[in-house]
Each structure stands twice: as structure tokens, then as C-alpha cells.
């Protein structure tokens, strides 16, 4: 069995492939990229995309097929809180006059699922 460093490298590579695939799929659906792996202090946003007056933050989760925790359930309350804070930090720096939404994208191998978008304030996470 590979050691944990090899497994970690494979997981990061899988995550990068999933993020790149998401970026291309969103672009094919008419979205324009704003930022990729945007670091805001200790927080990070995987993808920021725009279409018309809408800004969408995307969190991409990738798991190997048959993993114990699926990519669909991989977003914990703490992770959602960090994403909310990252998005707030971005909007403090770059005010956005239009709608702001959040969307999870899950990959298991090359199977992809786009979860329904949520209003960013709909995450209901206190400051």
C-alpha cells in the first residue's frame, strides 16, 4: 500500500483535475472565470465565475469511486463557515452589485454532480 505522502499527492492531483474540469464545464455553460484557488488570508475559494450580473463561488470536492466519505457529503459545517468567510472577505475587497451564489460540485472518479446553487447569504452561518 502506498504511504500517506503518495496518497496525499494523488488526492491533491485529483482535486486539481476536478477543479480544472469544473472550470471548463462552467465555461461551456457560458460562465467566465474570475479567480481560481483564490487565497484570502487563511481562507481559499476554489473557483469564482461570473455570468451576467451573477457571481458564483464554487467549492469542488473530489473523491475516488467507492471512497468511505463521498464527495456529496464532504462539506462540513466548519468548511461551509470558512467558505462563507472567504466570500465575505472577497466581497469586502471587490463589492459585487449583482447576485452572489454558492455552488458545490462533486466528483467521484470522472462522474460529476453539480448541486443546486444557493444564495450566498442562504448558507445561514453567523458572523
Feature locations, PLM:
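Conserved catalytic cores of phosphodiester-cleaving nucleases, focusing on short active-site segments
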Residues: 26, 45-70, 83
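Positively charged, solvent-exposed patches that mediate nucleic-acid binding
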Residues: 28, 41, 50, 105, ...
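Hydrophobic residues on conserved beta-strands that form the core of alpha/beta folds
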Residues: 33-35, 57, 102
Amino acid at each position: 500500500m502506498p504511504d500517506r505522502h503518495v496518497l496525499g499527492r494523488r488526492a491533491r492531483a485529483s482535486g486539481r483535475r476536478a477543479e480544472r474540469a469544473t472550470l471548463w464545464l462552467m465555461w461551456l455553460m457560458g460562465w467566465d472565470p474570475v479567480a481560481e484557488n483564490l487565497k484570502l488570508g487563511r481562507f481559499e475559494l476554489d473557483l469564482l465565475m461570473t455570468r451576467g450580473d451573477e457571481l458564483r463561488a464554487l467549492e469542488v470536492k473530489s473523491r475516488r469511486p467507492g471512497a468511505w466519505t463521498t464527495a456529496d457529503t464532504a462539506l462540513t459545517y466548519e468548511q461551509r463557515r470558512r467558505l462563507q468567510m472567504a466570500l465575505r472577505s472577497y466581497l469586502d475587497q471587490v463589492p459585487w452589485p449583482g447576485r452572489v451564489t454558492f455552488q458545490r460540485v462533486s466528483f467521484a472518479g470522472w462522474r460529476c454532480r453539480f448541486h443546486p446553487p444557493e444564495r450566498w447569504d442562504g448558507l445561514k452561518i453567523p458572523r
